[in-house]
Amino acid sequence: VDLPTGERWRESAAYTAGETAVVADTPIGRLGLAICYDLRFAGLFAALSDAGATALSIPAAFTRPTGAAHWHILMRARAIESAAFVIAAAQTGEHADGRATYGHSLVVDPWGEVLLDMGAAPGIGFAELDLGAVEAVRARVPVIAHRRAIPPVEIAP
């Protein structure tokens, strides 16, 4: 990420891209796993929901500028597109390396409603998840059932 302030942050300096999308079966359902920059790749979350994920775990450390501009809208979009809960723990505060992270750990329901927003202060938060909401939302808006491979793009003359 290149910020207008001249700051440059590269997850790729510490992490490499995975070769597979990962889900894990848990007591609350199938959990799709992703981190930080992954949030920007809608196709990953389509794959996770196609694999049966009913909740998505997305821990992250967004900078304050990118967080203010993108964090809430992307988290809500991924919840809506996947018709799944999003559980997103977020680093917050001022850091020794000069970073200032946005915070705002979130829990978002499958309809895109924010159930918990922790703001910029550190802390522990709790949200009650209605596990029936996933099935209800998927019945109301069957986007996963209607998802299909995108055909090749044609360039109009």
Regions found by a protein language model. Name each.
Residues 127, 132:
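Glycine-rich, small/acidic residue-mixed loop/short-helix segments
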